[in-house]
């Protein structure tokens, strides 16, 4: 039996060691022959010699590839040839892999990150733990003497206990007379004795409980201190335990023995409120063990009284650990055999890692190449696998009888196997049989077994076997299969040949491009951003949109392009021509769309045949808008030679000295001039008109600093270039001088300028595109000409000519031309516009020659009337009516032919055909247009017919011919066609797509690049000659690997099938068998949430977390997150970080509410989103479980049950980082400077000095900060500036630091984000300095009010973030009246940051200034401490008002594991397979019989391995919410969820009463009896008839006493003990009684051992109100009972008969 493997190095070579147990003996086998290797995929095999010649360095030694062997492997379902590169030593791999990967011939390298010893197990097919050897197990535990504040390992180990199958004993160094205790002379001898025990017993497995993090590291540290060699292993060279890092945690390895730490196994396996050894022992084995608190251990050891009790406690720890080890070890051994790795590894691995190791082993056995894990830059992202997208039925409340529980056996694995869900079967073309996933629509080939399903078939059987062996305690197979979502990546070879036309929207402009040229150009310009996967290149983009259609609603949509894709291709291509003249060239695997049975389906290139029907556009919807042309911008790309005589002018009226005055004003605004000009208001008014600033009653506010900066740059140029032209009373500037700054012109200002030639015609710079301009462009594109010729004087003459023979048309041409370009000349057959500006505009918009004419983008994006005007004018020039009465448009340009089809489709004209004859493209239109109309009946085109094949598929009968829409309606209305089936074809009439028949398919060979787009959501785009819809490659996770084996499509499909089968089963059991199923929610995008990403705290808008759509379920879109944790609140009231697997968004179609906390602090939530309110009362009840006071509440419920919401109020990061005193002073100074200092600027002084104003506190600041910092060299010197307390501080480095980090580009003060990562002490120091400079302490009603006031709300928001990080609750509000200076309004408004947690602020931050700190502390002494959330991680904030607000756009939510809560805008909010059923009123026997009949029925309908199982029958049960219910089975066993009171801070009387209530309801079916039980207990408590031991409350000390800022009852007792010299360490359980009396509860609690019935009386009100009633109301509230109904003296209560369903 193999226990473990590792390797050692001898003579520079690795030797594998196999630790084994064979025939009862331990042995180590060696294998020196195994060599490390990786795989490399090469573009060209001839480069292999270059690869072998690559050199690397390891520890000063040159290393290289020893040998290379070419091998054939399978990779994600296809054959590949790779090179196996062999090395001398495993450490050569990390030294060489980067160099090899960088070689240009290397596509990628694989399997380079598999540890050498694990690789050996996989390759050799060795399975740890296989065999029948009997393993010896030994458990041990230590007790330590820990003094408060001691470092880890400082206190002595006072006892070591151990246990095996034979005995349980204790070793100690104080005399204890017990048969199982061995006494030695001191701690050193005790450790040596334990080492001897391990040697003598020679266990194969050493069991600990949290030994990785406590027992063994502590033992190692003490052994080192005492000079004892801790020989616990069987490796003679290295027998000491070794601490290894495993991710973020540590693990201890004992070579030759398996160190089995129960703690991570238990945490992974079972769900408990607390994981102490006592709690786990009782929960798993149903046994109890003695408990000792820290104060008792300390007292016993120091006084040496009750030493036997301590020894028994220690011995029981070891025995409990051993018994739990016996229970859990066989499960982990089975798991190790399945995975093929050691128990040491498996027991400490996450579920995801276990899956991966299993797949690696199977992949090797099947000759599959494993995909790579992500590197640091490409994080592995995981789908949450519990219920995402699954079916949830809200429970039926009330008490029910005779309930069956049905569950699917291995639901997800069964789905995977049944439907062959695997990356290599996903959407595989050419298969005969497919299974299609519901909702998501992915297809899985059934012609061959997929990689994953073929593995899972055996696993499902294994899982059943392991499940039996593990007694249902752990189910690793099911867990791993639920984690299947991390499987595979697949790159689809769906591609288009390069010369296909593609309409694309780039930066808002519609362009028609050749797909190959376009993608090549983008990739060439952004080489550094192109990612290569195998031979596929992917470029992510964010400025492109494509024309697409929605497959569900069959409507045209504009969708974002996520990526451009190309790859080299050699193989078959197909030229597909449709009857309309459309055509496209695609590869064999690329899909177009067809319709089958009324549904849109993909059909691949090699599957398309003549006569097939293909989806084409009927109407293309555009994002229409009013359009204008910026002529200077339009011509700015022309050469300087072409625009040499172009000028821009503006009227001089009202602009005297304007340009220089504006420049001086702008310079003053940017701080570059000290004095503002006298007439600056003139320029401020102009800037406000442009939208660059906002004028206030006094002063102004810049609305867009970036635009203002560019405007200043423009005027720097204009002021030096503009000239006054007195002849025309205008200012003039040569276009070429300012062409580089044209984009900096605000359009509103440009509207006042004109542009033209120096001595000729000028037109407005901004030209509005209306119907007349559309008509002018239509004339020009059809029969226009733009030319430039040399004239007689040697110059250039420019003209635009519009040709036509019809005088009426010439008159129309003349009118529209003169409207825009002034006087024109009309000749016999043309209109001549002899203006250079007309020439430039037409050339830039539409092209000059017939071959390159185009419809400009401004027409395609204009409103429909403008497009119609263009089309009418074009038809007048290049259109005619064919003898068949069809309209015909002609052009020599292929581009223009495609644009004309696009234009027609955008106007809803779909009866279009395209022809080509004698070098001319003809576009035929077979329907009436708005302008010319014909009365002759036209032939009906494909776009107005429903093909007979489609009719046959839908209605199941033959039709003789295609059917017109009119005829179709008649037959449906008359009932001759089934109306329900007809609905499948409504899209032909109302939708935006039509079907076009394939005329021919030509197969050809192609070699070269092929291209594709990744289009968001719809996964298709418009492409090809004449334009048709093609399926795109899915890109997102599919672009490049994020993990080994990952497939979003597979994950979604499994979930969708799971939902489908659960819904189907519930529907069938209710509709056909008469059962009733009893059991089976967002914020706005601007909401800021607190996250921790890769260890760093960030404050981000929730919408910024949503980077892309990874998948959709219904209308909800999901973005998978990796490495992201959210700040949340657990049920103990503590702030914790929990993983966020995804962020979700959907369009807001609900009411939105704004919850105001102050007039400047709010949160926006939808009507159904839950906030977390706090159930407050007039009394503080610190013993009550906080989680029960956290109530989900909708916005409109605020102010009723809940008046307070929750904000953070505890540090967000550890406070144990080492800090230095001088660094603290440095950050205090920085805070002072930010608050009351000045720095930066262009003066010489500002390069070396900072200014600081300290006022009357100058001497104090000097002594506390400036002198020490000068002594340490942080500042060079400081000089008093005046008698007002101002200093000049000489510190060049500090000046640079402040400039770089504490001012933004606009010169405003800011707080850099790196401060979030500083130690808490330094952040507090900064805040201390800042509040000392700018903070105030005022007294209101005797209570100090701490504020920080500023007019910059952004700055205060940053300060708030720092306060949240250090754990100080705060709020912000704004003044409603403007500030005044010398009696005059300044136009600014003060914002106040107000400290809520004044006590923590005073203790942790406070003020540097003694007078402020003294004032604060003096008034805090008499102020009342808020008790309602004392000692917890949150504070309360009251709702000011709730109002409904208008909102359009996305709303967001995140999934937070375990708590399902997160802080949005610093307010806590909620984020949002089997089933129970009954037949009301029926007898149990009939219900069971019917259930079994249903199982036979449903299992006959379920495909493959899917099977519904009968899991149990329950006599009675009630369901409160979907996570709170209780049922009782036929043997009287009660199962509860979400109702238990199992925490220590519930007294025994509360637990006991709740249990009796459950028994009364479930066993006797009487809610009235339950109520009587409660009243009886309440009466006994009130009359002091309850035994004292039932009133004891147990609470744990969780941290050092000095870290408790608020004093709860257990902390109060612990501090009293500490004051008496009794040491209390974290982990100590305090057991106390609450006494009757007045005052705080923490003053009225005593230890149970101190209670004297002659002197003391417990507080009955406390136990009734805070213990018993809350515990039972968890149940009885569901039946309509309230607190007042349950007191024994109350009147008769109403019953629950209405709830009991008979």
UniProtKB/Swiss-Prot annotation:
Listed PROSITE patterns: INTEIN_C_TER (PS50818), INTEIN_ENDONUCLEASE (PS50819), INTEIN_N_TER (PS50817)
Applied use: Used in the PCR method because of its high thermostability and low error rate. Sold by New England Biolabs.
Reactions accelerated catalytically: DNA(n) + a 2'-deoxyribonucleoside 5'-triphosphate = DNA(n+1) + diphosphate
UniProt key word rRNA-binding: no
GO molecular function, one term: DNA binding
Post-translational modification: This protein undergoes a protein self splicing that involves a post-translational excision of the two intervening regions (inteins) followed by peptide ligation.
DOD-type homing endonuclease domain boundaries: 776-909, 1229-1368
Listed GO biological process terms: DNA-templated DNA replication; intein-mediated protein splicing; intron homing
InterPro entries according to UniProt: DNA-dir_DNA_pol_B (IPR006172), DNA-dir_DNA_pol_B_exonuc (IPR006133), DNA-dir_DNA_pol_B_multi_dom (IPR006134), DNA/RNA_pol_sf (IPR043502), DNA_pol_B_thumb (IPR042087), DNA_pol_palm_dom_sf (IPR023211), DNA_pol_type-B (IPR050240), Hint_dom_C (IPR003586)
Disulfide bonds: none
UniProt EC number: 2.7.7.7, 3.1.-.-
Annotated Pfam families: DNA_pol_B, DNA_pol_B_exo1, Intein_splicing, LAGLIDADG_3, PI-TkoII_IV
This protein's UniProt keywords: Autocatalytic cleavage, DNA replication, DNA-binding, DNA-directed DNA polymerase, Endonuclease, Hydrolase, Intron homing, Nuclease, Nucleotidyltransferase, Protein splicing, Repeat, Transferase
UniProt function note: In addition to polymerase activity, this DNA polymerase exhibits 3' to 5' exonuclease activity. Intein encoded endonucleases are thought to mediate intein mobility by site-specific recombination initiated by endonuclease cleavage at the 'homing site' in gene that lack the intein.
Family listed: Belongs to the DNA polymerase type-B family.
Protein name: DNA polymerase
Native source organism of the sequence: Thermococcus litoralis
Gene this protein is translated from: pol
């Amino acid at each position: 039996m193999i226990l473990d493997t590792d390797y050692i190095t001898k003579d520079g070579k690795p030797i594998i060691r196999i630790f084994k147990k064979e025939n009862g003996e331990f042995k180590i086998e060696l294998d020196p022959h195994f060599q490390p290797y990786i795989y490399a995929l090469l573009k060209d095999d001839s480069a292999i010699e270059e690869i072998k010649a690559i050199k690397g360095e390891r520890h000063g030694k040159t290393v290289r590839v020893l040998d290379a062997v070419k091998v054939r492997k399978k990779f994600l379902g296809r054959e590949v040839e790779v090179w196996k590169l062999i090395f001398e030593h495993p450490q050569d791999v990390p030294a060489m892999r980067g160099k090899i990967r960088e070689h240009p011939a290397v596509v990628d390298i694989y399997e380079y990150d598999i540890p050498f010893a694990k690789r050996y197990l996989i390759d050799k097919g060795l399975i740890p733990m296989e065999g029948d050897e009997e393993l010896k197990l030994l458990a041990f535990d230590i007790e330590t003497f820990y003094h408060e504040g001691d470092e880890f390992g400082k206190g002595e180990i006072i006892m070591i206990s151990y246990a095996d199958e034979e005995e349980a004993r204790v070793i100690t160094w104080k005399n204890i007379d017990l048969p199982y205790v061995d006494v030695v002379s001191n701690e050193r001898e005790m450790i040596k004795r334990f080492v001897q025990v391990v040697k003598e017993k020679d266990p194969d497995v050493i069991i600990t409980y949290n030994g990785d993090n406590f027992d063994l590291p502590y033992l190692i540290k003490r052994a080192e201190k005492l000079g004892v060699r801790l020989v616990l292993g069987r490796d003679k060279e290295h027998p000491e335990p070794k601490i290894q890092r495993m991710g973020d945690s540590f693990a201890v390895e004992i070579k030759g023995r398996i160190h089995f730490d129960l703690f991570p196994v238990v945490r992974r396996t079972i769900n408990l409120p607390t994981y102490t050894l006592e709690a786990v022992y009782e929960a798993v084995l149903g046994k109890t063990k003695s408990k000792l608190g820290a104060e008792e251990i300390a007292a016993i050891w120091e006084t040496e009284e009750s030493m036997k009790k301590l020894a028994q406690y220690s011995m029981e720890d070891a025995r409990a650990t051993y018994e739990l080890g016996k229970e859990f070890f066989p499960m982990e051994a089975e798991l190790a055999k399945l995975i093929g790795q050691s128990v040491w590894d498996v027991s400490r691995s996450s579920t995801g890692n276990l899956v991966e190791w299993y797949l690696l082993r199977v992949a090797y056995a099947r000759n599959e190449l494993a995909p790579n894990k992500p590197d640091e830059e490409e994080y592995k992202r995981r789908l949450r696998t519990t219920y995402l997208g699954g079916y949830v039925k809200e429970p039926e409340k009330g008490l029910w009888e005779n309930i069956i529980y049905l569950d699917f056996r291995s639901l997800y694995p069964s789905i995977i196997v049944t439907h062959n869900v695997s990356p290599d079967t996903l959407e595989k073309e050419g298969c005969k049989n497919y299974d299609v996933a519901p909702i998501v629509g992915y297809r899985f080939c059934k012609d061959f077994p997929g990689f994953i399903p073929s593995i899972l078939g055996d696993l499902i059987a294994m899982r059943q076997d392991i499940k039996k062996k593990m007694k249902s305690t752990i189910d690793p197979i099911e867990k791993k299969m639920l984690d299947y979502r991390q499987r595979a990546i697949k790159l689809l070879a769906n591609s288009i040949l390069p010369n296909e036309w593609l309409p694309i929207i780039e930066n808002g402009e519609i362009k028609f491009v050749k797909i190959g040229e376009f993608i090549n150009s983008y990739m060439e310009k952004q080489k550094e951003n192109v990612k290569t996967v195998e031979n596929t290149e992917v470029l992510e983009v964010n400025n492109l949109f494509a024309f697409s259609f929605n497959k569900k609603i069959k409507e045209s949509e504009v969708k974002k392009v996520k990526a451009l894709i190309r790859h080299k291709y050699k193989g078959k291509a197909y030229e597909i021509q449709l009857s309309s003249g459309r055509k496209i060239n695609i590869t064999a695997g690329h899909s177009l769309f067809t319709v089958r049975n009324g549904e849109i389906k993909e059909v691949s290139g090699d599957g398309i045949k003549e006569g097939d029907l293909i989806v084409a556009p009927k109407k293309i919807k555009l994002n229409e808008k009013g359009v204008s042309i910026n002529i200077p911008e339009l011509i700015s790309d022309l050469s300087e030679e072409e625009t040499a005589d172009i000028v821009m002018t503006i009227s001089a009226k009202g602009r005297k000295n304007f340009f220089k005055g504006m420049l001086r004003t702008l310079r003053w605004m940017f701080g570059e001039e000290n004095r503002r000009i006298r007439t600056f208001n003139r320029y401020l008014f102009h800037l406000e008109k442009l939208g660059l600033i906002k004028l206030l009653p006094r002063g102004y506010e810049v609305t867009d600093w970036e635009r203002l900066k560019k405007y200043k740059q423009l005027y720097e140029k204009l002021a030096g270039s503009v000239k006054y032209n007195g002849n025309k009373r205008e200012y003039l500037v040569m276009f070429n001088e300012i062409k580089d700054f044209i984009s900096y012109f605000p359009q509103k200002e440009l509207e006042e300028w004109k542009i033209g030639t120096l001595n000729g015609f000028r037109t407005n710079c901004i030209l509005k595109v209306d119907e007349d301009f559309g008509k002018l462009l239509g004339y020009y594109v059809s029969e226009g000409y733009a030319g430039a010729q040399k004239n007689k004087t040697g110059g250039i003459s420019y003209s635009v000519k519009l040709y036509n023979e019809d005088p009426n048309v010439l008159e129309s041409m003349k009118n529209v031309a003169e409207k825009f370009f002034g006087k024109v000349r009309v000749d016999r057959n043309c209109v001549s516009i002899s203006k250079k500006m007309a020439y430039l505009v037409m050339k830039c918009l539409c092209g000059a020659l017939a071959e390159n004419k185009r419809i400009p983008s401004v027409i395609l994006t204009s409103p429909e009337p403008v497009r119609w005007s263009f089309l009418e004018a074009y038809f007048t020039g290049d259109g005619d009516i064919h003898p068949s009465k069809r309209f015909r448009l002609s052009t020599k340009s292929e581009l223009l032919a495609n644009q004309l089809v696009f234009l027609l489709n955008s106007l809803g004209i779909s009866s279009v055909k395209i022809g080509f004859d004698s070098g001319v493209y003809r576009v035929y239109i077979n329907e009436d247009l708005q302008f010319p109309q014909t009365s002759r009946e036209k032939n009906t085109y494909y776009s107005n017919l429903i093909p007979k094949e489609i009719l046959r598929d839908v209605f199941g009968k033959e039709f003789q011919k295609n059917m017109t829409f009119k005829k179709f309606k008649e037959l449906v209305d008359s009932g001759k066609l089934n109306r329900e089936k007809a609905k499948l074809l409504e899209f032909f009439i109302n939708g935006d797509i039509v079907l076009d028949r394939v005329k021919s398919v030509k197969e050809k060979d192609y070699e070269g690049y092929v291209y594709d787009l990744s289009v968001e959501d719809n996964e298709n785009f418009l492409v090809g000659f004449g334009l048709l819809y093609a399926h795109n490659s899915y890109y997102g996770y599919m672009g490049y690997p994020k993990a080994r084996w990952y497939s979003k499509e597979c994950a979604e499909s499994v979930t969708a099938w799971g939902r489908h089968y659960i819904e189907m089963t519930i529907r069938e059991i209710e509709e056909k068998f008469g059962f009733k199923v009893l059991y089976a929610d967002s914020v706005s995008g601007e909401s800021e949430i607190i996250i921790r990403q890769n260890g760093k705290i960030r404050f981000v808008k929730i919408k910024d977390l949503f980077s892309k759509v990874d998948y959709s379920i219904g209308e909800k879109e999901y973005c998978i997150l990796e490495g992201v944790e959210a700040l949340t609140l657990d049920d103990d009231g503590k702030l914790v970080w929990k993983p966020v697997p995804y962020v979700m968004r959907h369009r807001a179609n609900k009411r939105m509410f704004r919850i105001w906390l102050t007039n400047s602090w709010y949160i926006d939530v939808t009507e159904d989103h839950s906030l977390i309110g706090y159930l407050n009362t007039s009394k503080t009840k610190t013993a009550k479980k906080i989680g029960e006071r956290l109530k989900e509440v909708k916005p409109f419920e605020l102010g009723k049950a809940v008046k307070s919401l929750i904000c953070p109020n505890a540090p967000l990061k550890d406070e144990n980082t080492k800090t230095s005193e001088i660094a603290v002073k440095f950050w205090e100074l920085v805070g002072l400077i930010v608050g009351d200092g000045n720095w930066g600027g262009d003066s010489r002084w500002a390069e070396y000095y900072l200014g600081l104003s300290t006022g009357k506190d100058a001497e104090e600041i000097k002594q506390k900060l400036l002198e020490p910092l000068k002594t340490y060299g942080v500042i060079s010197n400081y000089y008093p500036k005046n008698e007002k307390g101002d200093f000049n501080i000489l510190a060049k480095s500090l000046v640079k630091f402040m400039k770089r980090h504490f001012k933004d580009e606009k010169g405003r003060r800011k707080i850099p984000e790196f401060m979030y990562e500083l130690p808490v002490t330094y952040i507090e120091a900064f805040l201390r300095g800042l509040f000392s400079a700018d903070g105030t302490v005022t007294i209101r009603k005797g209570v100090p009010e701490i504020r920080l006031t500023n007019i910059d709300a952004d700055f205060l928001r940053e300060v708030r973030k720092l306060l949240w990080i250090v754990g100080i609750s705060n709020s912000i509000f704004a003044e409603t009246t403007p500030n005044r200076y010398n009696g005059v309004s300044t136009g600014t408004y003060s914002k106040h940051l107000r400290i809520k947690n004044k006590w923590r602020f005073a203790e942790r931050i406070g003020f540097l200034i003694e007078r402020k700190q003294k004032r604060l502390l003096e008034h805090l002494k008499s102020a009342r401490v808020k008790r309602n959330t004392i000692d917890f991680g949150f504070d309360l904030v009251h709702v000011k008002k709730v109002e409904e607000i208008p909102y359009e756009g996305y709303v967001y939510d995140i999934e937070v594991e375990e708590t399902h809560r997160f802080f949005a805008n610093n307010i806590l909010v909620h984020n949002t397979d089997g089933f129970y059923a009954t037949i009301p009123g029926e007898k149990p026997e009939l219900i069971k019989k019917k259930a079994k009949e249903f199982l036979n029925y449903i299992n006959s309908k379920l495909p493959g391995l899917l099977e519904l199982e009968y899991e149990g029958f329950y006599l009675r049960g009630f369901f409160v919410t979907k996570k709170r219910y209780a049922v009782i089975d036929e043997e009287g066993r009660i199962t509860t969820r979400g109702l238990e009171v199992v925490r220590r801070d519930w007294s025994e009387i509360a637990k006991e009463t709740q249990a009796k209530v459950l028994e009364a309801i479930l066993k006797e079916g009487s809610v009235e009896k339950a109520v009587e039980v409660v009243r009886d207990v309440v009466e006994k408590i009130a009359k002091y008839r309850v035994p004292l031991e039932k009133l004891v409350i147990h609470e744990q000390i969780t941290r050092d006493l000095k870290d408790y800022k608020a004093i709860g009852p257990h902390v109060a007792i612990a501090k009293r003990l500490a004051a008496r010299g009794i040491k209390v360490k974290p982990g100590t359980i305090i057991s106390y009684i609450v006494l009757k009396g007045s005052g705080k509860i923490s003053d009225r609690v005593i230890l149970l051992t101190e209670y004297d019935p002659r002197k003391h009386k417990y507080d009955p009100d406390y136990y009734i109100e805070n213990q018993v009633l809350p515990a039972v109301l968890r149940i009885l509230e569901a039946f309509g009972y309230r607190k007042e109904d349950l007191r024994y003296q109350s009147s008769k209560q109403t019953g629950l008969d209405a709830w009991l369903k008979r």
